[in-house]
């Protein structure tokens, strides 16, 4: 019985680490995309002047997707186990690759929206993993990491933009 508990705990910790790192990557992608939104709009509209509303579509759609994801995440978790639900969220998060290679602004917007869905689901599932698999004396540390994960991602982007700004914004 003790071996089974240790295996379950180690799997839970591994799942938590994967979800935490995934959310940090999501946050980095989100912050970088937000910081580069002017250049992204300029790129997709070939330098033409567009309504400020068009350039804000990304932020609004991602906010809507994240609200939707928070509501749907619990339902998906009830229908699937935490591992399968997390895999679904990670697959949705992979739509960031579609966004990077999108050929038009609207495909980019849809891909970012789906990616945001996955990111929000990951946040919900991290809390579930903490509650289910992390020992009570370690939960406060895990919860602090969950809370800090977005800021860690944003901090990484700030460091990268500070050190490599010319490289990051060139060749748009």
Residue ranges, per PLM feature:
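Residue-level signature of mid-helix packing/kink "hotspots" within the transmembrane helices
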Residues: 31, 62-71, 155
């Amino acid at each position: 019985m003790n071996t089974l508990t240790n295996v379950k705990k180690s799997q839970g910790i591994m799942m938590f680490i994967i979800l935490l790192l995934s959310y940090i990557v999501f946050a980095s992608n989100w912050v970088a995309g937000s910081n580069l939104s002017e250049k992204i709009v300029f790129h997709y509209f070939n330098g033409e002047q567009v309504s400020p509303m068009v350039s804000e579509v990304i932020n609004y759609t991602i906010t809507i997707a994240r609200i939707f994801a928070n509501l749907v995440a619990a339902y998906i978790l009830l229908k699937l186990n935490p591992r399968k639900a997390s895999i679904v969220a990670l697959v949705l998060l992979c739509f960031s690759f579609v966004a990077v290679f999108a050929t038009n602004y609207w495909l980019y917007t849809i891909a970012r929206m789906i990616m945001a869905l996955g990111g929000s689901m990951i946040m919900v599932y991290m809390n579930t993993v903490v509650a289910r698999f992390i020992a009570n004396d370690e939960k406060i540390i895990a919860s602090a990491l969950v809370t800090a994960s977005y800021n860690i991602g944003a901090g990484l982007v700030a460091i990268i933009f500070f050190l490599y700004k010319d490289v990051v914004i060139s060749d748009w």
